[in-house]
Regions:
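Conserved beta-strand hairpin/beta-sheet module of binuclear metal-dependent hydrolase folds
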Residues: 28-76, 162-166, 170-176
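Solvent-exposed loop/turn segments at secondary-structure junctions
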Residues: 43-46, 55-56, 62-66, 92-97, ...
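Accessory terminal helices/loops
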Residues: 17-20, 205-207, 219-289
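Metallo-beta-lactamase
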Residues: 54-56, 60-64, 140, 147, ...
Length: 289
């Protein structure tokens, strides 16, 4: 065996996780733009937009890793010395919005849906910095010639989730309720499983071409409208399949063991995530809702 063959064999012998290790954080410019960036920390990611007058950033993603928020700010500083004007919360869940103090210290105005403000105040968590400004249905942030449209699209993964669209760049940032090319899995635990379909349809009706999800998709790729449609089709199919099982009295345990969605078995997260999807829909159809 020559040295090259030996090296290949040794690499192949490594466990998958060792081959796929990646740095704990990464900042990437969105291809085809000169001002839109994705900051990834572990399994979470956020978007920030650089303009001639300042920066619009999203979700600090500091839950369990407060130092990473400082890193996020430092990564922005590597790109631009312009002030961070806004920090936008996608929704109120702490895994996405904990740790915003470094942004607040940098002078950012924190914007979110009004329900996010109410939820944050009710939780009284010192790591969740309260909002400065809120809105109910829609708001557009305009800074340095760039517009970011913030839209509340109803109940989905939470009751406070907004999506953020860059009309010029045709980019959408949507968190948790629109995973790219994968089974939602444990994210279904607190889904509004019927209402989320309406949210996705609203997003599909908007003008955009690329989707930045709040959790990296397979290969860290950005999503497309086809990905959004595929997710909607998956949820509808899962809902109808579990409804049929519920009518046969199979919810909960039997349905989790027996219900399969072979069309989606190649999606990442299928094996571990499908039982959680079934459980959530059993919570609807198995109770006669």
């Amino acid at each position: 065996m020559n040295r090259f063959s030996l090296a290949v064999a040794l690499l192949a012998a490594l466990p998958v996780w060792a081959q796929s290790q990646r740095p704990p954080y990464q900042t990437t410019k969105v291809e085809g733009t000169d001002n839109v960036y994705v900051f990834r920390a572990g399994g979470h990611q956020s978007m920030f937009v650089v303009t001639k007058d300042g920066v619009i950033a999203t979700d600090p993603i500091g839950y369990g890793r407060p130092q990473m928020v400082k890193t996020y700010v430092e990564e922005i500083r590597k790109v631009t010395d312009k002030p961070i004007k806004y920090l936008v919360y996608s929704h109120h869940h702490n895994d996405h919005i904990s740790g915003a103090k470094p942004f607040k210290d940098a002078g950012a105005t924190i914007v979110a849906h009004r329900r996010a403000r109410d939820r944050i105040l009710a939780q009284n968590d010192p790591e969740m910095v309260p909002t400065d400004e809120v809105f109910s249905k829609q708001r557009t942030l305009r800074l340095g010639g760039t517009a970011v449209e913030l839209t509340y699209v109803g109940l989905n993964h939470s009751d406070s989730t907004i999506v953020m669209r860059l009309p010029k760049e045709k980019i959408m940032f949507a968190v948790d309720f629109l995973p790219v090319g994968q089974v939602p899995g444990r994210g279904m635990i607190d889904f509004y499983p019927l209402e989320v379909e309406g949210s996705i349809k609203q997003v599909l009706a908007m003008d955009w071409e690329r989707l930045i999800p709040g959790h990296p998709g397979p290969g860290d790729r950005l999503g497309t409208k086809q990905d959004a449609q595929d997710q909607l089709d998956f949820l509808r199919y899962a809902s109808e399949t579990v409804k049929a099982a519920a009518r046969e009295g199979k919810c909960w345990d039997q349905a989790e063991k027996e219900v399969k969605l072979p069309k989606y078995e190649k999606w990442p997260g299928y094996e571990n995530g499908l039982p959680l999807v079934i459980r959530r829909y059993c919570g609807i159809w198995g109770r006669g809702t």
